[in-house]
Amino acid sequence: MNITVYHASCAEVKNPSVDVNGENLGFGKGFYLTNSKAEAEAWARKIAAENGKDANPIISVYEFNYFKTKNVGYRFNEFETYNKEWLNFVVDCRKGKDVTADYDIVIAGGLDNEIADIVEDYENNNITAEEAVEQLRYNDVKFQICILNQEIIDFNLEFVEQLTM
């Protein structure tokens, strides 16, 4: 069974690579996707705004064979909710710690501006982990997928189309 997923950018990405996105992101260095078209649109607008007036928000659409990927034996790290384990994982990734080496793919709640602010407050010791988790529980989990293993992209992710906004 395939799942439609989206990648936000300023360019069409027909041949994705795990080396595209930087190392100190929420789930480390990898290729980031979401299963929410609305989230992808919001991210594409943000990325385009950060890249100047000539940048156009673009969404690349893919079909991802989640169940085949899961059943073949790739190593998944999945968080269904925002919790203390998720919080510490994200903080470690943002600090550049190599916490993703044991995984091929991470699926978890992503970091929009509000979530990122809470994580930063925790990182800066302005709030405790318990306070952060309490604040996070009021937010809907907007799932993000970070593929860390190029083989998953090459054999389980198929480009469908580009959407220019």
Where are these regions (language model features)?
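Short aromatic-glycine-(Arg/Gly/Cys) micro-motifs in beta-strand/loop hairpins
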Residues: 1-26
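A short, exposed loop/beta-hairpin motif centered on an aromatic-Gly-Thr core
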Residues: 27-32
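Short, well-ordered alpha-helical microsegments
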Residues: 15, 40-41
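Conserved NAD+-utilizing ADP-ribose enzyme module
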Residues: 2, 25-26, 41-42, 46-165
